[in-house]
Amino acid sequence: MEAYKSEFIQFALSRQVLKFGEFTLKSGRISPYFFNAGLFNTGADLARLGEFYAKAIQASGVEYDVIFGPAYKGLPIATTVSVALFNHFQIDKPVCFNRKEAKDHGEGGQLIGYGLSGKILLVDDVITAGTAIRESMTLIAQNQAELSAVMIALNRQEKGKGELSAIQEVERDYQCQVLSIVNFDDLMTFIEQAPEYQQYLPAMRAYREQYGVK
């Protein structure tokens, strides 16, 4: 596992963004871990978060022209990612956001920032049902742009209602890559190498056996 992945997991644990234990998800599933990126909520947190996204983007080799952050959680992520790419890699990319509701005054419209053109890198925290991606795809298509890839913090590698995960459905429906800083397998690798967390291994393995994608 790359060093930045292990560092990200440690960072998420230190900020209580990632917790191990027993948690009831909205789906009703009992999960042995919980991830809430909304707890990255200080300037220092967001600066580090952006750096991890930037490292993952660079490691992926993905090609893109514009960074797009879907409302609302994607807005601060897109901002900190663009700053981190410039500060750490001297890569200067334009940023675009959308409003949930279009404005008919001021600058108007549904988009804020650079606009959508060329190859789009969409950044968000997680993909649960894929709703934000589907809404974003409408905007991207309306602007004759192309979704190059989606970058999220955590890929749960978990089935939805069928055999595919929401991420696999997005990849299938839009022929794009969904990339992540870390995934469930990375969490497992981290736990296996960290004695203080090995008590959670049986529950994590059982969860993967029951809900993990093939």
Swiss-Prot record:
Annotated metabolic or biological route of this protein: Pyrimidine metabolism; UMP biosynthesis via de novo pathway; UMP from orotate: step 1/2
Cited InterPro entries: OPRT, Or_phspho_trans_dom, PRibTrfase_dom, PRTase-like
One GO CC term, this protein: cytoplasm
Top enzyme category: transferase
Annotated positions binding orotate: 34-35, 128, 156
TM region(s), chain numbering: none
Amino acids binding 5-phospho-alpha-D-ribose 1-diphosphate: 26, 72-73, 99-100, 103, 105, 124-132
Keyword Cytoplasm in annotation: no
HAMAP family: PyrE (MF_01208)
Similarity comment text for this entry: Belongs to the purine/pyrimidine phosphoribosyltransferase family. PyrE subfamily.
Name of this chain's protein: Orotate phosphoribosyltransferase
Taxonomic lineage of the native organism: Bacteria, Pseudomonadati, Pseudomonadota, Gammaproteobacteria, Pasteurellales
